[in-house]
Curated annotation (Swiss-Prot):
This is UDP-N-acetylenolpyruvoylglucosamine reductase. Belongs to the MurB family. Its EC number is 1.3.1.98. It catalyses: UDP-N-acetyl-alpha-D-muramate + NADP(+) = UDP-N-acetyl-3-O-(1-carboxyvinyl)-alpha-D-glucosamine + NADPH + H(+). It holds the Pfam family MurB_C. Keywords: Cell cycle, Cell division, Cell shape, Cell wall biogenesis/degradation, Cytoplasm, FAD, Flavoprotein, NADP, Oxidoreductase, Peptidoglycan synthesis. It comes from Idiomarina loihiensis (strain ATCC BAA-735 / DSM 15497 / L2-TR). Its main location: cytoplasm. Cell wall formation.
């Protein structure tokens, strides 16, 4: 068995039967993909809550190609590239559009899976194509934006885990850059708002709000911000007039899950060494030697109390992996 604690940012004690590091796309077709298997990037959105009785395939594909076109840049990035370093390198080259997503943990290949988003920007806005190995059909596929079926923190890759091994992502970034600053604290920036100012502000805020996983093991935002309809919103605002929410399309709003957790007095909640981060309630942390059981019990405790108080069922944004694959958490309403 192979240790996995250093392979995921929450550093839970777990092992796997076998581990493969993929460093060349030429090797993809030779992989057996014997079940159970799990496709892993940098492990910043994965928690191994138990020993995994299968093979972990770590994507270590590297390389970035930039093609300048008349009105945009076409950038092809290998899936194993570190996301923040990729964004920072583009910013240094004055290729902008992804600056709101600075310091989002993980790899380039994980970005379309989660459709990562922050401060008003989702990565799907800029994705032109995803190249992947179709494990089921045993063939290469190039998937455009529509085929990826992007939604809020969702995609076809997340809906069908283990079906595709992403090897590269193509981004199109327009030269006619427009700042996105309608989310706090970016909406408080004064004077000329440059891409560098947005990048620096996002990095500063994230470093203040989110613990460094190298110091305090965590996986960033543990829960999604739930989306509810206006009728549900009206009912909750009668109960909690100061509840934090953001409008989204089609008569729906997005509720701040961190506000719900903190408002219900769960900011000091813990089970064993798993705890709610005192500075950002949406983040759960490993204080020292948390176990998979600690974190799942804490998550279920939070989900149940939020559901009982609001009727909202929080969904984990992170992926929980147990003995045979993904584990789904759910509580009775």
């Amino acid at each position: 068995m192979i240790e996995l604690a250093e392979r995921h940012s929450f550093k839970l004690p777990a092992q796997c039967r076998a581990l493969i590091e993929l460093k060349s796309s030429d090797d993809v077709e030779q992989l057996a993909f014997e079940e159970p298997y799990y496709l892993l990037g940098e492990g910043s959105n994965t928690l191994f809550v138990d020993d995994f009785y299968g093979t972990v395939i770590c994507n270590r594909l590297l390389g970035v190609c930039i093609e300048e076109q008349e009105s945009s840049y076409l950038i092809t990035a290998a899936a194993g590239e570190n996301w923040h370093n990729f964004v920072a390198d583009l910013r240094a080259r004055s290729i902008d559009g992804l600056e709101n997503l600075a310091l989002v943990p993980g790899s380039v290949g994980a970005a379309p899976v989660q459709n990562v988003g922050a401060y008003g920007v989702e990565v799907s806005t800029f994705i032109e194509q995803v190249t992947a190995w179709d494990i089921k059909e045993k063939c290469w596929v190039s998937m455009n934006k529509e085929a990826c079926q992007f939604a809020y923190r969702d995609s076809v890759f997340k809906q069908h885990p283990g079906r595709w091994l992403i090897t590269s992502v193509v981004f199109r970034l327009p030269k006619d850059w427009q700042p996105v600053t309608h989310y706090a604290p970016l909406n408080q920036l004064q004077g000329h708002v440059s891409a560098q100012k947005i990048f620096d502000t996002v990095v500063e805020v994230r470093q203040k709000k989110l613990p460094d996983p190298k110091v305090i093991p965590n996986a960033g935002s543990f829960f999604k911000n739930p989306v509810i309809n206006k009728a549900q919103l009206d009912g909750l605002l009668q109960k909690w007039p100061d509840m934090v929410y953001f409008p989204v399309a089609d008569n729906h709003v997005k509720v701040a899950a961190g506000w719900l957790i903190e408002h219900l007095g769960l900011k000091s909640a813990f089970v064993g060494d798993a705890a709610v981060n005192p500075h950002q309630a949406l983040v759960l942390i490993n204080k020292a030697q948390a176990t998979g059981s600690d974190i799942t019990q804490l998550a279920l405790k939070i989900m149940k109390q939020v559901a009982d108080a609001s009727g909202i069922m929080l969904e984990p944004e992170v992926r929980l992996v147990g003995q045979h694959g993904l584990v789904q958490l759910a509580v009775e309403k």
